[in-house]
Every structure is written in C-alpha cells, then in structure tokens.
Swiss-Prot record:
Keywords: Carbohydrate metabolism, Glycoprotein, Glycosidase, Hydrolase, Multifunctional enzyme, Polysaccharide degradation, Signal, Xylan degradation. One of its GO terms (molecular function) is xylan 1,4-beta-xylosidase activity. InterPro entries: A-L-arabinofuranosidase_B_cat (IPR015289), ABFB (IPR038964), AbfB_ABD (IPR007934), AbfB_ABD_sf (IPR036195), ConA-like_dom_sf (IPR013320). Its EC number is 3.2.1.55, 3.2.1.37. This is Arabinofuranosidase/B-xylosidase. It comes from Trichoderma koningii (Hypocrea koningii). Gene3D superfamilies: 2.60.120.200, 2.80.10.50. Residues 1-21 form the signal peptide. Belongs to the glycosyl hydrolase 54 family. Glycans are attached at N467. It is an enzyme of class 3 (hydrolase).
C-alpha cells in the first residue's frame, strides 16, 4: 500500500502545475471518497471544472462564480475584474464532491453573529492572496465574527461512523478564542453534548486541551472540549506549529482517532496522536451529527480567527498512506505568499500625510486629537503642532511586514490601531492583539484616487472618515459608519509627503 502511495505522490510531483490527480481522486483510490470538498484556491478533483466559490460585490449586489482555469487553480483574474472599483465578499464556497454540501453564511445558534438577524460575517474576497505554482488565488480570511455552515449536509459521518478530513491553513493566523474549526458539527447550531462534533481546530486556546510549547496547535473539536489526545489536558506529542502553510488532518472511527499535520509547502505528515477516544463520558461512542462548519464552533462560537485555503471530509477512515499521498499533492500545488498591497507604494521610514477625497472634505487630513483619530483641515500655514498631528511615519506592519503600521510623528511609540471598529492612537504594548489591530494593507483607491487602507485583521474593513472621525468600516453593515452612501470616496485617501 505504501509503495502505491509513493507512486501516486511521485506522479503528483512530476505533473507540476497541472496535477494529474487531485486530493479527492487520491482519497477515492484509497477507498475513502470525499463527501465534501471545499477550496477557493483550486480544484480538488482532477476533472472538476465547476464553480469553486461565489463573490458578491458591494456596488450593485451582483454575484459571480469563480471557477478553475485549465491548471486547476482558481481564476483570480475573473474575480479581480468583477470586483474592480468596489468591494467583494465570499458568499458561497461550493462543494466539489457533487453532493451539494456548499458552505454559506452561518446562521445564529448558541451564539449570535454580528450581522443582521444574528448571522455571521462573510469573508473578504481579497484578504488572503496566495499563489499556487505561481498562479494567483485567494483563500478565506476568517476574522472574529466570520463563519460559514451547512446544517443539512449529505453523506457526512453521523453517530460513530468513520470519517477523515484535512485542511490547508495559514499557520501564522490564529488566536486563542473559540473556535476556528473546519469539519463535522451539530445540525441545529447549538451545543448538544459531548461527542457531537469532530472537527479540525487550529489556534492557541488553553481552555481545554493543549500541546507542547505555547501553540498554535492542531487539535480536534469534539464538542465541549478541544482535544490533543486521549487526555482532556496536555499531549506533549502535539507540537506548536510555525509553518506559514500547514496541513492539518483529523480522522475518527469507533474508539480510534488521530491527529496528523505537517508543512503544506514541503515534506511529509507526522502523526501527533493516534489511539483511543478521550477517556471522558460521551466520546465513546461518538454522536456526530453531520453538519459542516468553517471558522466557527458547533454552537456558532465565533471568536476564532484563521485562514482556510482548502479542505475535504471523507466517508471512511483514511489510511496514513492515503493521507501521505494527499500531502504530496498539496506540496506539489506549491502554495506561496502573494503581495498583500497594491496601488501607490509606501516607503517604510517615510513621513506621510493622508488627504480625504470626498467632495466635502478635500482640505481635511487624517490627524489625531489625543487618542482620537479624526480628520482636520491642515495646510502648509497651519501651526507646527497640527502639522505634526497630521503626519505619520510608515513602519513595517507590526503583525505582518507585508503590510504597514502608522506611527504618530508627535507621539513616538504610538500607532493608529482599531478598537471596537474605531481608529485610535495608542502606545504599542507589545501584544499580539495590538500588533494585529495596528496593521493595515494599502490598495489602489477604490474611487480611483490615491489609496484605500484596509485592516489586515478585518480585511472587509477600511479606514473611513465619517462625521470627521475615523473608523474601520465595511461597505454596508450594521454600524452607521458602514453606510454604503459615499463609501468609495470616504475610504480613498491621497498620500503625500508628511507635513512634518
């Protein structure tokens, strides 16, 4: 069996950019076919030519489906053309298995989401650019509050039935909140008891199980616990992950389950746990319900964050050899980082000022009054203090150096950050949260002028001036500053040399 796996793997690698067999072809050959297959980056069957995902644009609410090119990689250029001059959200992630197990905006459950009627947020269509074999594609960047779900899935494991699953994730994008998951969950979006889930979890939560080091870890969300092994506590064999692209795999059958993982860009999978179910009531036998979740917990806990590129769920318990062949296929796809910024270039270390382009406000610049970030009328004849308040030093992004952070010229060590969706000026406290809140990515101005500046950690949200105060705003949403009227103008700023 292992020799066959090596043959399959070699074929995948030799095929280069046009992979002969996709992950689901490999699972099928191993006798554990995919019953759900989701990816915004590529086809997961060699013969799949249908839609990968759907995007909806903010300008007119129109939608379009993004399909793979002949290489199997998503047609990112079609998305870029459709979304030009506006914003786009990922509304559907299509199931490639033929079972119709598509993922859509998650409804409320035990926890409500931040959108109208308690629904979760949808992901930005541009928050997670990557390349596969040099071809651009977009992943699914899940900010807290974002989630997708299908509570009426077909063919997924129920009860104690055997299943497997894997996901390719961003190993650098995570948090300790509950719960960035992909996999099998409750059908009513509520916690129905121990053993009613079986999903991949990625993050550094320490509320339930843990692995070695400080995390993040690949664990299993089995409901009412994140498990790293048979104990509800620590499994020293479950390592902290530091790969940019990570393959995470979970599989389970009666009184047997496993955690496997590895670098999605090179090398093989390792087994972090393989053995009996947790020695806690409710997990042997399992009571899986068969819904599918992405980015959230089974009860719609939506505080987690992470990035998803591809993943599947299978019928039956895949062999290690089959999973090893799938890993070789993933490595052959050659995931790599892509630029997070576009439009007018910024130079780290330079001083800049940012002028509004909305017709009302073209003499106003982004400035601060104490900790409040606002717009003020500034000119070359303004007082020195005001010119300093309206000048910002460009720094490499504190959370991601492919983007930027903006340090105050007159308050050294203080940066623009978002807090409760408002922009404020705070001293850098060195925390992971501060770094993420203070990291922003530039793109060509949505209204055609200058630059628009989106939050790295909430890429649906942009610097916006609203009643002269600065927010991170989405193009339509539940907050007054998310209003669609004048959005494109309000989020576009002309960058110039700093006043000071």
């Amino acid at each position: 069996m292992l020799s066959n796996a090596r043959i399959i793997a070699a074929g995948c690698i030799a095929a280069g950019s046009l992979v002969a067999a996709g992950p689901c072809d490999i699972y099928s050959s191993g006798g554990t076919p995919c019953v759900a297959a989701h990816s915004t980056t590529r086809a997961l069957f060699s013969a799949y030519t249908g839609p990968l995902y759907q995007v909806k644009r903010g300008s007119d609410g129109a939608t379009t489906a993004i399909s793979p090119l002949s290489s199997g990689v998503a047609n990112a250029a079609a998305q870029d053309a459709f979304c030009a001059g506006t914003t786009c959200l990922i509304t559907i992630i299509y199931d490639q298995s033929g079972r119709g197990n598509h993922l859509r905006e998650a409804p409320p459950g035990g926890f409500s989401g931040p959108e109208s009627n308690g629904y979760d947020n949808l992901a930005s269509a541009i928050g997670a650019p990557v390349t596969l074999n040099g071809q651009k594609a977009y992943g699914v960047f899940v900010s807290p509050g974002t989630g997708y779900r299908n509570n009426a899935a077909s063919g997924t494991a129920k009860g104690d039935a055997a299943e497997g699953m894997y996901a390719v994730l961003d190993g650098t994008h995570y948090n300790g909140a509950c719960c960035f998951d992909y996999g099998n969950a409750e059908t009513n979006s509520r916690d129905t008891g121990n053993g009613h889930m079986e999903a991949i979890y990625f993050g550094d939560s320490t509320v339930w199980g843990t692995g070695s080091g400080k995390g993040p870890w690949i664990m299993a969300d089995l409901e009412n616990g994140l498990f790293s092994g048979s104990s509800p506590g620590n499994n020293a064999g479950d390592p902290s992950i530091s790969y940019r692209f990570v393959t995470a795999a979970i599989k389970g059958q009666p009184n047997q389950w496993a955690i496997r993982g590895g670098n999605a860009a090179s090398g093989s999978l390792s087994t972090f746990y393989s053995g009996a179910r947790p020695q806690v009531s409710g997990y042997n036998p399992m009571s899986k319900e068969g819904a599918i979740i992405l980015g959230i917990g089974g009860d719609n806990s939506n505080g987690g964050q992470g990035t998803f590129y591809e993943g599947v769920m299978t019928s039956g318990y895949p062999s290690d050899a089959t999973e090893n062949s799938v890993q070789a296929n993933i490595v052959a796809a050659r995931y790599a980082v892509a630029p997070l910024t576009s439009g007018p270039a910024l130079t780290v270390g330079s001083s800049i000022s940012l002028r509004a382009t909305t017709a009302c406000c073209t003499t106003r610049y982004i400035a601060h009054s104490g900790s409040t970030v606002n717009t003020q009328v500034v000119s070359s004849s303004s007082a020195t203090a005001l010119k300093q308040q309206a000048s910002w030093t460009v720094r490499a992004g504190l959370a991601n150096n492919a983007c930027f952070s903006f340090e105050s010229q007159d308050t050294s060590g203080s940066y623009i950050r978002h807090s409760n969706f408002g922009l404020v000026l705070n001293a850098n406290d060195g925390s992971k949260l501060f770094a993420e809140d203070a990291t922003f990515c530039t793109q060509a101005g949505i209204n055609g002028q200058g630059s628009s500046i989106r939050s790295w950690s909430y890429p649906t949200r942009y610097f916006r001036h609203y009643n002269n105060t600065l927010y991170i705003a989405s193009n339509g949403g539940v907050h007054v500053f998310d209003a669609t009227a004048a959005f494109n103008d309000d989020v576009s700023f002309v960058v110039s040399g700093g006043f000071a």
